[in-house]
């Protein structure tokens, strides 16, 4: 079966990207209902959408005003495709503006709303089926709709928003001023599910097995009989990519595992044992630790660290690939969240990701990124579907730059060792407490801060280690994990007693946002 025939057999809901940092959550929520969904540029044409043949279209939120000179628009023929359309926030305003309604600029009618608000449903609607007449939703808008287009009617309002939900059932056009994709909209999932299943008619039968078939077909079509080089980092993402690629192209895949001197304790041997031994991947192990650490000496800026590591990885691959024959592709474990955090055409860059930023312009390979439409929890599900053991699939997420971004300031062997040893203790105690599946991610950070302490009746002046532990569903938002005090106490006691050059432990209680998961 070709990639085209596989894709045509999969029902799809397309989300048009209008610039919200979290609009990809819309696609993620829809996938939870067993419906494939992905983001496309707002510049997509009606003809291009016809070729994709989606069963539904969502217009995402965004920071712009429909009146701005640089406002993101829409091909007007999209409204004539007879495909159900749901406009969210800016998307609703765009529908209104383009179809003859009225949108009032921010502040003119006291219409700004930020935070949770109560939605009052005034009429029944398939979109809100099974949800209460009054419900909490997350509003985040300045402009507001004050007159709706012909053929539309009011479904719901809020105290500060006269048109919080509208619809034209004859043309299957729906608009909501709030954000159902975020958890602060209590019945947001129900609303999106109603759109996908009841309005768009989705079967809800998309699964990771479908994804595997699609990606294998895509990889085989792209690669043909050529060869692929994969950089193994030791993390879940690159490991899953390796197994998927091997399933698709077999011995056309060569893996390079670069030991850059920034790995967790014993990680190099574990990677070789699991992937090289159990799964039979062809892995070349390269000890490039001195090469990386020399380049990183005295570098304090986190963006410079990422760029240096991203560049050097590719240069190492270049060196190794030159010893091989006919390698045309470089595979990476880039995820959806990596791309969004690195910025898109419509979204601001939060921080560059080592897989999508810092690559040199003269790179000799074409890129293959099989996971770049998946979120972290979906990658784990993919690993299980590929038959990978849980000890690999549930490995703690580990960034490509490794411990370089878990050491604040300049990197030294001494600092790296404090993080390796403290992180090993943290992971061991979390597992002993049976919390390793409940906590999304956990690791330690050398803060670069020294403080005075007393050990053995003597004065110390040593490093402060921070513990970071979070809970999350998809990695886009996160809360700090409320670890039991007795577990934290045991971890702290062990670290200060067993790890040299550490005399103080702190616990990071910051959510995302405003913080990111990693410190750098």
UniProtKB/Swiss-Prot annotation:
Its EC number is 6.3.5.2. It comes from Streptococcus pyogenes serotype M5 (strain Manfredo). Residues 12-205 form the Glutamine amidotransferase type-1 domain. The keyword ATP-binding applies. One of its GO terms (molecular function) is GMP synthase activity. The keyword Magnesium does not apply. Keywords: ATP-binding, Glutamine amidotransferase, GMP biosynthesis, Ligase, Nucleotide-binding, Purine biosynthesis. The active site is at 89 (nucleophile), 179, 181. Homodimer. Catalyzes the synthesis of GMP from XMP. It comes from the Bacteria. ATP binds at residues 233-239. It holds the Pfam family NAD_synthase. This is GMP synthase [glutamine-hydrolyzing]. Pathway: Purine metabolism; GMP biosynthesis; GMP from XMP (L-Gln route): step 1/1. InterPro entries: Class_I_gatase-like (IPR029062), GATASE (IPR017926), GMP_synth_C (IPR001674), GMP_synth_GATase (IPR004739), GMP_synthase (IPR022955), GMPS_ATP_PPase_dom (IPR025777), NAD/GMP_synthase (IPR022310), Rossmann-like_a/b/a_fold (IPR014729). CDD domains: GATase1_GMP_Synthase, GMP_synthase_C. It catalyses: XMP + L-glutamine + ATP + H2O = GMP + L-glutamate + AMP + diphosphate + 2 H(+). One of its GO terms (cellular component) is cytosol. The gene is guaA. Residues 206-395 form the GMPS ATP-PPase domain.
């Amino acid at each position: 079966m070709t990639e085209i025939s596989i894709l045509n057999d999969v029902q799809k809901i397309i989300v048009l990207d209008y610039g919200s940092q979290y609009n990809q959550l819309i696609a993620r929520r829809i996938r939870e209902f067993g419906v494939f969904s992905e983001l496309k540029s707002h510049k997509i044409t009606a003809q291009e959408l016809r070729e994709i043949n989606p069963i539904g279209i969502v217009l995402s939120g965004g920071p712009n005003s429909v009146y701005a000179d640089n406002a993101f628009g829409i091909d007007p023929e999209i409204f004539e495709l007879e495909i159900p359309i749901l406009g969210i926030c800016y998307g609703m305003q765009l529908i209104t503006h383009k179809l003859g309604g009225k949108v009032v600029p921010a502040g003119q009618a006291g219409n700004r709303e930020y935070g949770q608000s109560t939605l009052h449903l005034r009429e029944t609607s398939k979109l809100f089926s099974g949800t209460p007449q009054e419900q909490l939703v997350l509003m985040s808008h300045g402009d507001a709709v004050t007159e709706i287009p012909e053929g539309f009617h009011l479904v719901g309002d809020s105290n500060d928003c006269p048109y919080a939900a509208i619809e034209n059932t004859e043309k299957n056009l729906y608009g909501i001023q709030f954000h159902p994709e975020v958890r602060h909209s209590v019945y947001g999932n129900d609303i999106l599910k109603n759109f996908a299943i009841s309005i768009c008619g989705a079967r809800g039968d998309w699964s990771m097995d479908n994804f595997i078939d699609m990606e294998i077909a895509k990889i085989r079509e792209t690669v043909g009989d050529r060869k692929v080089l994969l950089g193994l980092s030791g993390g879940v993402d690159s490991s899953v990519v390796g197994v998927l690629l091997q399933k698709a192209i077999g011995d056309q895949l060569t893996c390079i595992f670069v030991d850059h001197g920034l790995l967790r304790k014993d990680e190099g041997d574990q990677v070789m044992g699991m992937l090289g031994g159990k799964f039979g991947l062809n892995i070349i192990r390269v000890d490039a630790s001195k090469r990386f650490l020399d380049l990183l000496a005295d570098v304090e800026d986190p963006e410079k660290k990422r760029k240096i590591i991203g560049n050097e990885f590719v240069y190492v691959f270049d060196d190794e690939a030159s010893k091989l024959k006919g390698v045309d592709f470089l595979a990476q474990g880039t995820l959806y969240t990596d791309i969004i955090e690195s910025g898109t055409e419509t979204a601001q860059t939060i921080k560059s990701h080592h897989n999508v930023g810092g690559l040199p312009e003269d790179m000799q390979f074409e890129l293959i990124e099989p996971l770049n439409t998946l979120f972290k929890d979906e990658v784990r599900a993919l690993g299980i579907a590929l038959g990978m053991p849980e000890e690999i699939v549930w490995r703690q997420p580990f960034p490509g730059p490794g411990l370089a971004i878990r050491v604040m300031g300049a990197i030294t062997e001494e600092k790296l060792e404090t993080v390796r040893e403290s992180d090993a203790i943290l992971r061991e105690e979390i597992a002993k407490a049976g919390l390793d599946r409940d906590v999304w991610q956990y690791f330690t950070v050398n803060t670069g801060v020294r403080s005075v302490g007393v050990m053995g009746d003597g004065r110390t002046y040593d490093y402060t280690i921070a513990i970071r532990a979070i809970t999350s569903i998809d990695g886009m938002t996160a809360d700090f994990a409320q670890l039991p005090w007795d577990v934290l106490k045991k971890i702290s006691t062990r670290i200060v007693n067993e790890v040299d050059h550490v005399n103080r432990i702190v616990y990071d209680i910051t959510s995302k946002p405003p913080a990111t998961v990693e410190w750098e």
